[in-house]
Amino acid sequence: MASSSSVLLVVVLFAVFLGSAYGIPKVPPGPNITATYGDKWLDAKSTWYGKPTGAGPKDNGGACGYKDVDKPPFSGMTGCGNTPIFKSGRGCGSCFEIKCTKPEACSGEPVVVHITDDNEEPIAPYHFDLSGHAFGAMAKKGDEQKLRSAGELELQFRRVKCKYPEGTKVTFHVEKGSNPNYLALLVKYVNGDGDVVAVDIKEKGKDKWIELKESWGAIWRIDTPDKLTGPFTVRYTTEGGTKTEAEDVIPEGWKADTSYESK
């Protein structure tokens, strides 16, 4: 009969085998990249996905809930962040400068990407799985496809303030399925920190703020027995603590699957 130590050894070896076979993380994620970590360049691995010149996901969306990320103002300069970058959705909308110096096709010049999707592949403490367009943007002019053919490379990154093109307004998308007793909001195009960590609404003529809960990605929601009629003022808080109010941005008679811009 096998000894208990022999059985334990077999179990351990089997666990190691399963870890190798099924991709149990071998490289733990790094510390979260916050809005206040500073401007030091850090090392990361980078890959790309989707069409070579596309915005990543087939539907031009992603785990943050944004749509049409191939169009302005994201314009396909998008990517997935791993755990310390995506942060269970709280990293959605944050901006990073990235650059590479190897292979030779790299320009060495930084470009800005927006976090719009999630990536949990455990290949490095920090990992950006970029759109094909964003990956190619790190190349010397004319060498975009040559760089994409590398597949995976080392890059340097740092978090930066988001600076959307002039005229871009913070936008609140009332998600599909919203009704007077259920409201889900996606907040996007936030300058500065870029990401949102809290959302509250206030009905016109009332003093009380109603806190929304995180749903998924960049979407916040509330279920209430009392009907929400609007107009609503929306207050959103970024990771750095900045609070901004968009007065009466959601009008009376609001509709689901509709976007409303701040004034």
From Swiss-Prot:
Annotated signal peptide: 1-23
Keyword Glycoprotein part of the UniProt annotation: yes
Any one GO CC term of the record: extracellular region
InterPro entries, alphabetized: Expan_Lol_pI, Expansin/allergen_DPBB_dom, Expansin_CBD, Expansin_CBD_sf, LolPI, RlpA-like_DPBB, RlpA-like_sf
Main location: secreted
Domain Expansin-like CBD intervals: 181-262
Location relative to the cell: Secreted
A Gene Ontology BP annotation from the UniProt entry: sexual reproduction
Keywords, sorted A to Z: Allergen, Disulfide bond, Glycoprotein, Secreted, Signal
Domain Expansin-like EG45: 61-167
SUPFAM superfamilies: Barwin-like endoglucanases (SSF50685), PHL pollen allergen (SSF49590)
Bilayer-spanning residue ranges: none
Glycosylation sites: 32
Disulfide-bond pairs as recorded: 64-92, 95-162, 100-106
Assembly and binders: Homodimer.
Protein family membership: Belongs to the expansin family. Expansin B subfamily.
Name of protein: Pollen allergen Phl p 1
The species this protein was found in: Phleum pratense
